Amino acid sequence: MDGENPIEKALAGALIGANSPDCPPKFAQALHYSVFPGGARIRPKLLMAVANACGDVDPSAMIAGACAIELLHCASLVHDDLPCFDGAAYRRGKPSVHVAFGERLAVLAGDALIVEAFAATAAYPQITRIVAKWASAPHGICAGQAWECEDSLNLVNYQRAKTGALFAACTMAGALAARCDPKPWQNLGMMIGEAFQVADDIRDVAGISGEMGKPTGQDAAHGLPNMVSTFGYDGAVQYLESVLSRIVEAIPECPGRQELGQQIVAVTRAMVPKQLHRGAA
């Protein structure tokens, strides 16, 4: 999934206000630190891949949606790492925002990124509505984080909200940016989110912290269920393979259907720790 330059340019443009002399300097630094340098930018690249697979792309709408979703993702990472949730000391191979700038600025930076996400799609109300749907309650990323505050949780509902929601926003907004009906693309996004969550659960148990760019063993440390604790290690790897096979079948008819399926499977498999590639092939 190529196209990093347009995404980075759009993200920089979304944070242009932080360059103003009126913006508190430490806050401005925290905002940029939260977004740059980024991770793999998987979500915005997925949105763009879906749009390009569909064909008749509105480039401006596509980039706006991709930017908005990545800003929301970055905001969710900043908040997820806070001591009141995971208390993760580092992210993307560097100290977490709250470690580098303090909890107060981390909260404010995450909040500001959410606001900027919706500002990015202001000219595209249909995309804004999709992003809003999957960011809020009861099924969005906020609900996913809120499940961690409950005495008990349903693993499927928890993972669909925390991970699947934003991937559904990606596939639906990507289709919309190509002037297609977004509804048939919702299920695909949820399934991709499921695959990524299973892969992340496997990495959390078996991955190397340095390779992942974030601490491992977080679910066990916080008493949260995951696919490995539920199905066992081998069972989780097998489950991932079954999800990947269903993903390819779930892609709606579009001109670039075959290539899109290959891209999704390749990117998801790449998340499995290197030493497990043979077992997950």
Predicted feature residues:
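N-terminal amphipathic/basic leader segments beginning at the initiator methionine
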Residues: 1-19
